[in-house]
Amino acid sequence: MDKNIIKLLTILLIIITTICLIIFSGNKTNESKIKGNIENSENSKTTNTDDGSKISEKNINIVTSFYPIYVMTINVTNGVYGVNVSNMSENLKGCIHDYTLSTDDLKKVEKADVFIETGENLEPFSNKIKSIYPNVKIIDSGKNVSNLISEEENENKNENKNENKNENKDKNENDKSEETSESEVNPHIWMNTKNYCEQVTEIAKQLGEIDINNKEKYMENAENYNKKLDEISNKFSELNLSGVRAVSLDEQLEYLLRQNGMDVISIETDHENSALSADVVSKTINEMKENNVKAIFIDKDSDDKNAKMLANETGARIYRLNSAMNGDNSYDSYIKDMNQNYEILKQVKEYNGRWVDGQMWITFNENNEF
């Protein structure tokens, strides 16, 4: 065969082989692209909520307003795949109701699918979040809480303690049957352990409506967590501090004290400037003396200046309780805090004290502090 013909055939063979390789490679590339598009499509599935916002069925980013809500939420979502929970105000050591949103806070909320708050007007920035991020689903955990304390109720109790007791009792019962406006409610609802359980249930219920595939898991987690919380509530019920009269210098503590049956004189202070006016101090001291009030309660992180001033004038003892507003981010953080409070409240009833005509008299050290 002519050498030129052989050379030509060799060149044609090389060209044909190259073309085949190019075609085969292109098919593999297209196949990979199609497969990738399918996977991306599956990972970006969404579900519509009642308000029209879309939540990913694969990953849900939840942001909580502050620490107590964070602890509730991690318990409700425990073991649910694809759910990420973060706390917006993670560096906050006190109450959220005087909090101002930072740029970093807004960035966190911007990335959220769900924002969970206390409700009852505790978070003053709630409307701002709704306005800026209308597609973020907001869960009001306090939506169906039943044990609320109103400011009006406190005023009536403090002003009329020794007058018209039967009339006040009837009025308080009527107040409970009427709807209380947000501005009148003490919003620190989580400090009543029964309220806390209701908040946990509400979070689970609303998350189940958003993430239907995990609805049963959310409710199961809530039920298991609430069983542990019920044990704390039962311990408080058995403690029975009914009839004990006390002063609370931190309004969030009032929920826990009243849950335990205590008769509380609540003194509301400005969170930015906690100094009490001379008039308030004078009235409080007189009321404490008239009613033999021997217990003053403050938060574990609060300044004790006001408490010591009242204690020095009345001989009352100071007790520090944990408001569960910060902690170690553990699942049982709230339970540990409430058990600690239980031990302290037990001391109110037992520590070097005795009961006389329904009143409690306590001996205390030179610092007037437990």
PLM features per residue range, with description:
Residues 2-353, 358-361, 365-366:
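Extracytoplasmic metal-acquisition and chelation regions
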